[in-house]
C-alpha cells in the first residue's frame, strides 16, 4: 500500500529490515566507520520503506491512498538548449515521471527542472540544503516562471499554499510537521540529491510521497557506498550526461616540495592518518602560501577571473588579505549581498564546500585547487559554464604535494582530467616560464 509517507510493508521479513539498515563505508586509514542507521520507519503493523525500494523489491502496491495533489497553471518562459541536452532531459523526465537527473555543472539542471515542473503542472516543492541555493532557486523561478507564487519551508516558516515551495533539507529532517502538511505537493525536486543518503537527511522524504520526485546531482555516485539510498527514494537515473571532449580546458599541474615532506604526514593517537591536521598544516606553510600568492599574481595579470579553492576558511581569509582591492570571499554564513559583491571581483576565494555545490558565477574561467582533494568534478565545473562575453578557455591550476596520500588524491584528479579530454601540456626544458607550461617543480 502506498501512503503519504511511503510504501507500507505489513509483517516484513527480517531480510528487508536488514537490507534497509545501512552503514557508510569509509577508508580505515582515515578513521573509524560510523554506526549503521535504518532507512525505514515503524508502523502499526509493519514498516514504511522508501517508495522505489518497495516497488523494486515487492512490486507495485495494491492500493494508493495518497491524497490528490494541487494543480498549478504556471508557464515556463525560457528556451532549452540542445547543446547541453536540456530538451532531451525534459523529454526523459516526463517519460520517466521520477528518478535521478545527472547533468554536469553549467548544463542547466535548474532550468530543466523548472520546465519539468511546469510541464507536469503540480504544486512543486524544491528541497535544498543551503540558504544561498534557496535564494538562487527563487531568482530562477522569478526569471523563468514569472507570476508564480513562491513560499518557504524553513524553521518556523511553512508557506505551502504556493505554486513553488522552497524547503530547507535540515528543517524537513529535524522538525516535526503536522500530519498532511505536504499533501498538496505533487512534484518534489531535490537539489544536490546525494545529500539525502545521510542518516538524518534521509528522514526528510518520509514526510511526503509525491506523485513525481526528481533528484538533481552532477555527481550522484557517493564514495561511501550509500548511493543505493538515493535510488530507493527516487528510482533509477533516467538521464545522465558526462562532460567529455573538452579539449579547450587546460590543466597546469604544479608540484610543491618542502623538507617537511621527507617526514611522515601527521597521524592521530590511534596511528591513523589525520587528514584534517595534514590539510591545516599545508594551509599554514609559509613557503607554500608564498607560492600561491605568486601564482595568483601571474594568472591575474590578464583578463581572467580566478576562483581559488581551499578546504579552510582561515586559509581563504589569509590569502584574500594579500589582494584586498581585487578579491572577495565566497563562503558559508555570508550575507547574500556580500556574496553578490564578491562574485564581481577578479579573484574569488572560496571553500570547496561552498563551491562544490551551487556556486553560480558564469564569468569564472580559471581555478586554483589550493588544497588536496579527490572529488573535484563539481568544483572544476564552476569555471565551465558558457556565457556571453566569456573570452578565455577554462584553466585549472592543480597544486599537488609530496606526501603519498596527496599523490593518491592527485592520481584520482588525473583520471578526471583524462576522462574529460582536458589538455595537459608537458614541460619543455627550454620554456622560460614554468607556470605557462603547466608542469613545474617549485622549491622555495
Positions of predicted regions on the chain:
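Walker A/P-loop
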Residues: 96-120, 125
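Conserved helix/coil segment N-terminal to the catalytic DExD/H
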Residues: 154-187, 198-203
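Post-DEXD/H (motif II) to motif III coupling segment of the RecA-like Helicase ATP-binding lobe
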Residues: 186, 194-255, 417
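Conserved interdomain hinge at the start of the Helicase C-terminal
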Residues: 116-117, 268-311, 317-321
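Conserved helicase ATPase core of P-loop NTP-dependent helicases/translocases
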Residues: 135, 148-161, 177, 307, ...
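A conserved SF2-helicase RecA2
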Residues: 228-253, 258-268, 377, 385-444
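Conserved RecA-like P-loop NTPase helicase motor core
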Residues: 219, 328, 332-420
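Conserved pre-motif I regulatory segment
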Residues: 36-39, 62-102
Amino acid at each position: 500500500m502506498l501512503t503519504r509517507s511511503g510504501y507500507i510493508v505489513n509483517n516484513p521479513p527480517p531480510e528487508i529490515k536488514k537490507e534497509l539498515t545501512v552503514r557508510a563505508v569509509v577508508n580505515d586509514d582515515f578513521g573509524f566507520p560510523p554506526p549503521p542507521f535504518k532507512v525505514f520507519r515503524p508502523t502499526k503493523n509493519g514498516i514504511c520503506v522508501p517508495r522505489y525500494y518497495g516497488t523494486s523489491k515487492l512490486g507495485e502496491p495494491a492500493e494508493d491512498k495518497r491524497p490528490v495533489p494541487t494543480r498549478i497553471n504556471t508557464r515556463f518562459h525560457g528556451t532549452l538548449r540542445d547543446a547541453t541536452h536540456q530538451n532531451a532531459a525534459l523529454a526523459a523526465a516526463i517519460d520517466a515521471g521520477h528518478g535521478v537527473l545527472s547533468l554536469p555543472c553549467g548544463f542547466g539542471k535548474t532550468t530543466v527542472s523548472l520546465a519539468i515542473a511546469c510541464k507536469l503542472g503540480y504544486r512543486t516543492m524544491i528541497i535544498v540544503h543551503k540558504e544561498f541555493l534557496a535564494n538562487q532557486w527563487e531568482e530562477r523561478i522569478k526569471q523563468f516562471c514569472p507570476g508564480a507564487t513562491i513560499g518557504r519551508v524553513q524553521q518556523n516558516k511553512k508557506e505551502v499554499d504556493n505554486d513553488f515551495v522552497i524547503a530547507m533539507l535540515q528543517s524537513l529532517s529535524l522538525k516535526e510537521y503536522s500530519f498532511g502538511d505536504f499533501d498538496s505537493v505533487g512534484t518534489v525536486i531535490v537539489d544536490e540529491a546525494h545529500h539525502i543518503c545521510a542518516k538524518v537527511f534521509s528522514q526528510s522524504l518520509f514526510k511526503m510521497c509525491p506523485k513525481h520526485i526528481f533528484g538533481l546531482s552532477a555527481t550522484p555516485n557517493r564514495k561511501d557506498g550509500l548511493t543505493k539510498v538515493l535510488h530507493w527514494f527516487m528510482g533509477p537515473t533516467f538521464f545522465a550526461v558526462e562532460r567529455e571532449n573538452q579539449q579547450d580546458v587546460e590543466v597546469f599541474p604544479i608540484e610543491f616540495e618542502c623538507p617537511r615532506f621527507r617526514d611522515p604526514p601527521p597521524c592521530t593517537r590511534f596511528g591513523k592518518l589525520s587528514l584534517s591536521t595534514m590539510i591545516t598544516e599545508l594551509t599554514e606553510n609559509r613557503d607554500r602560501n608564498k607560492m600561491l600568492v605568486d601564482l595568483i599574481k601571474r594568472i591575474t595579470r590578464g583578463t581572467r577571473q580566478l576562483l581559488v579553492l581551499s578546504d579552510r576558511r582561515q586559509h581563504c581569509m589569509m590569502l584574500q588579505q594579500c589582494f584586498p582591492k581585487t578579491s572577495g570571499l565566497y563562503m558559508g554564513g555570508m550575507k547574500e549581498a556580500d556574496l553578490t559583491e564578491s562574485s564581481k571581483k577578479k579573484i574569488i576565494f572560496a571553500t570547496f564546500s561552498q563551491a562544490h555545490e551551487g556556486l553560480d558565477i558564469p564569468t569564472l574561467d580559471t581555478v586554483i585547487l589550493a588544497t588536496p582533494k579527490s572529488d573535484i568534478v563539481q568544483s572544476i565545473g564552476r569555471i565551465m559554464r558558457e556565457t556571453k562575453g566569456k573570452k578565455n578557455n577554462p584553466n585549472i591550476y592543480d597544486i599537488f604535494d609530496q606526501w603519498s596520500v596527496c599523490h593518491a588524491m592527485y592520481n584520482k584528479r588525473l583520471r578526471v582530467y583524462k576522462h574529460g579530454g582536458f589538455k595537459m601540456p608537458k614541460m619543455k626544458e627550454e620554456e622560460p616560464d614554468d607556470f605557462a607550461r603547466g608542469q613545474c617543480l617549485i622549491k622555495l
